[in-house]
Amino acid sequence: EQGDLNIALHGLHGDAPHLVLAPNGVGDCLQTTRWAVMLAEQLQAPAIVLSDQFLGQARAAIDAPADPPLAGERARAAAGVADYRRYALTPSGVSPMAIPGTPGGAYTADGLEHGERGTPSSQAADHVAQMAKRRSKLELHDYGELWADVDGAGELAVVTFGSCTGPLREALSQLAGTAPAMRL
């Protein structure tokens, strides 16, 4: 439903970067979820996987899923770092994360804006720097071949997710030649 999509895209507190993914059918659910977990680990950002009632209750015979090497590798901080900065400004936008209990890896985590060490800050410079960092990690990441499932050619595109994908694919094939070319 459109409302679900709007909440997933815009329903978080503040300007927090997050990922929204959706399977296109029953056979795509496992791969989409694996990819969401991998991206959440790599980008240190929440990932939302959209589904719908039909996909959740469907029974289908599908091919055994491939076991692709989707490994979410965290940027980890070295042990014993003297000046650990949990939210360090890095070229990739992803800061090294200390495993809990790592010597020298303590930091403050709360819901307020902060500087590189995690200390809450109301300074405009800290806010601007951290917002740019959050944006850059989504923009600079290589999402690979799974980024989007786009079929067709044309200037118009129909965006869909979940169980609506099959009927829309069929409708576009029936419109072929009678309507402007569209992508799905």
What are these regions (language model features)?
Residues 32, 37-184:
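Flexible, low-complexity linker and terminal segments
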Residues 14-22:
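Short beta-alpha connecting loops at secondary-structure transitions
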Residues 1-15:
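Flexible glycine/proline-rich, aromatic-decorated loop/lid segments
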